[in-house]
């Protein structure tokens, strides 16, 4: 596991304490093998009832250095409801990512796939294709004090291939 900013590594690699570092907010790339990251999103500016959620991010699998054919099952949960799983086809390298800092070695992961997740009254969709029947109503957003968004890799997934998350 690890994380980097635009300027340097944030703490030592393979030390989970970095996830509690105040510098974590500077991360531009986060990687780990299994587990999940959680974001707690305020509902103060949300008009209820919420009809749909759109969540987008760049991600790929994780393996030391990179391997373009290294699959990983990446799952999303909202308010602890599993909304769907996407199988990333690989951990991509060999050409420099557009926003990677100069210190980041070319042998490492360079870029991911832009993913778009939509949850509405018909189900959950990944890049326009339905991946589950979980709807907005099942997320029970009005009864929670915030919206919990988790992205990760289950320890018992078919393809436990880690995750790289790119961006702010």
Kindly give the residue locations of the regions a language model identified.
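Hydrophobic beta-strand core residues of beta-sandwich domains
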Residues: 44-47, 141, 157
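Low-complexity, polar-biased intrinsically disordered regions enriched in Pro/Ser/Thr/Gly
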Residues: 65-69, 95-97, 128-136, 165-167
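Extracellular Ig-like/FN3 beta-sandwich strand-entry sites
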Residues: 50-52, 142-148
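Beta-sandwich interaction modules
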Residues: 107-142
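Proprotein-processing/basic-patch segments
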Residues: 154-168
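Mid-protein regulatory/catalytic core that forms ligand/cofactor-binding pockets
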Residues: 1-106
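Short beta-strand-plus-loop segments that form exposed binding edges in beta-rich domains
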Residues: 116-122, 150-158
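Short, hydrophobic/aromatic-enriched beta-strand segments in well-ordered soluble domains
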Residues: 57, 145-153
């Amino acid at each position: 596991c690890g994380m980097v900013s635009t300027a340097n590594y944030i703490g030592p690699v393979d030390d989970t304490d970095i996830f509690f570092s105040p510098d974590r907010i500077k991360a531009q790339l986060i990687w780990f093998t299994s587990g999940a990251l959680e974001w707690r999103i305020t509902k103060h500016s949300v008009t209820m009832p919420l009809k749909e959620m759109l969540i987008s991010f760049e991600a790929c699998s994780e393996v030391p250095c990179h391997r373009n054919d290294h699959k990983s099952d990446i799952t999303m949960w909202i308010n602890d409801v599993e909304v769907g799983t996407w199988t990333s086809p690989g951990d991509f390298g060999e050409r420099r990512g557009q926003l990677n800092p100069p210190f980041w070695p070319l042998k490492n992961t360079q870029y991911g796939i832009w993913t778009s997740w939509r949850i509405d009254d018909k189900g959950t969709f990944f890049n326009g294709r339905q991946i589950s029947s979980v709807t907005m109503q099942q997320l029970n957003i009005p009864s929670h004090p915030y919206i919990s968004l988790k992205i990760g890799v289950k320890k018992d997934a078919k393809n436990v291939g880690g995750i790289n998350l790119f961006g702010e």
